[in-house]
Design a protein with these regions (language model features):
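Short glycine/proline- and aromatic-enriched beta-strand/turn motifs that initiate or cap beta-hairpins
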Residues: 22-80, 281-283
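Outer-envelope beta-barrel architecture signal
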Residues: 28-36, 73-81, 118-126, 166-172, ...
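Transmembrane beta-strands of outer-membrane beta-barrel pores
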Residues: 40-46, 85-91, 128-136, 176-184, ...
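Extracellular loop and loop/strand-boundary signature of outer-membrane beta-barrel proteins
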Residues: 47-55, 89-98, 140-147, 205-209, ...
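Residues that define the transmembrane beta-barrel architecture of outer-membrane proteins
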Residues: 54-62, 98-106, 120, 145-155, ...
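Residues on the lipid-exposed face of transmembrane beta-strands in outer-membrane beta-barrel proteins
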Residues: 62-70, 104-112, 126, 155-161, ...
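Outer-membrane beta-barrel transmembrane domain signature
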Residues: 142-229
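Predominantly the C-terminal beta-signal and adjacent terminal strand-loop region
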Residues: 169, 175, 185-187, 207, ...
Length: 283
């Protein structure tokens, strides 16, 4: 419990630093890249607290991203905000029961940018992520739902490559986010939410997490291409979230195909551009 409280304190401190860095970045550049993606795909959910069976089905997802350069390390660090909202409808293997799931995930990463060449950029740095959601199994009467609440510190890396096909500018991006240390809420094995919140008989419900008990990885692959003055973006997301705490196992595996658009904006003038000056572009 002391370790978990320590991690919570570190996360709170880092969050304050990140908010300061975001404010500081306003003075570095007015250029910002924003994108909005929507998509659908496959979901595999398993919650041993609710059922011994996996549930598989469809998922819908919304992603909003914002990136801009900061003044950190002589202006070579970019800040990235990522917001994921997804909902799933799944069945067990015999299709005799359904489960509903919903997650809200937010992350902020600071990437140091290495310009390998004029076309290739390597970015790496720390990341903070917060995740909230619920999985509902309509057949269970005593414990019909499992709350999802976890977050922590991790590492984030990105590769961006720009090229042309028939004089059409294209940008491909691969990103991987790896949680390293954090905290997670979980009931104990056989413990109900009534015992935790009504009877106040909760046990160890806030736990320390690491690669050992929460081995997770989120990967995103996108391709940008212009259509007139609009930058279209298509992508594929592989989101592997899993944990084993309090003798309870859980996982949510998502594979989604995304489509949307990206915008390069000069904030104070409201000017949208297909490209940015190379010295201030975060992407």
């Amino acid at each position: 419990m002391k370790v978990a409280r320590g991690i919570c304190w570190i996360i709170s401190l880092l969050l304050c630093k990140i908010l300061c860095a975001q404010t500081d970045s306003l003075h570095a550049t007015h250029y910002v890249m924003r994108s909005t993606l929507v998509g659908a795909g496959f979901n595999n959910t398993f919650e041993s607290y609710l059922s011994p069976l996996e549930y598989k089905g469809a998922e819908m997802r919304f992603i909003h991203e914002s990136m801009r350069m900061t003044r950190l390390m002589s202006g070579k660090v970019s800040g990235q905000n990522l917001l994921h909202v997804n909902a799933s409808y799944t069945d067990n293997i015999s299709q005799t029961n359904h489960a509903y799931g919903g997650m809200l995930s937010w992350s902020y990463a600071l990437h140091y940018q290495f310009s390998v060449s004029e076309r290739l950029k390597l970015m790496i740095g720390p990341m903070l992520d917060v995740n909230l959601g619920v999985v509902y199994n309509r057949r269970n009467s005593n414990n019909p739902a499992q709350a999802k609440a976890y977050g922590g510190l991790g590492a984030s890396g990105m590769l961006i490559y720009k090229f042309h096909i028939a004089q059409c500018p294209l940008t491909v991006r691969y990103q991987a986010d790896l949680p390293l240390l954090g905290v997670m809420f979980s009931p104990e094995y056989g413990e109900s939410y009534y015992e935790i919140f009504s009877l106040k008989n909760g046990g160890k419900n806030v736990l320390f997490t690491s690669l050992y008990n929460r081995p997770s990885l989120r990967q995103l692959l996108t391709l940008d291409f212009p259509i007139r003055r609009t930058i279209m973006r298509i992508g594929y997301l592989c989101d592997i979230q899993q944990a084993h705490v309090n003798k309870l196992k859980s996982h949510i595996y998502s594979h989604d195909f995304m489509i949307g658009f990206a915008r390069n904006i000069y904030l104070f003038r409201g000017k949208k551009q297909i490209s940015m000056p190379s010295k201030v572009t975060p992407f």
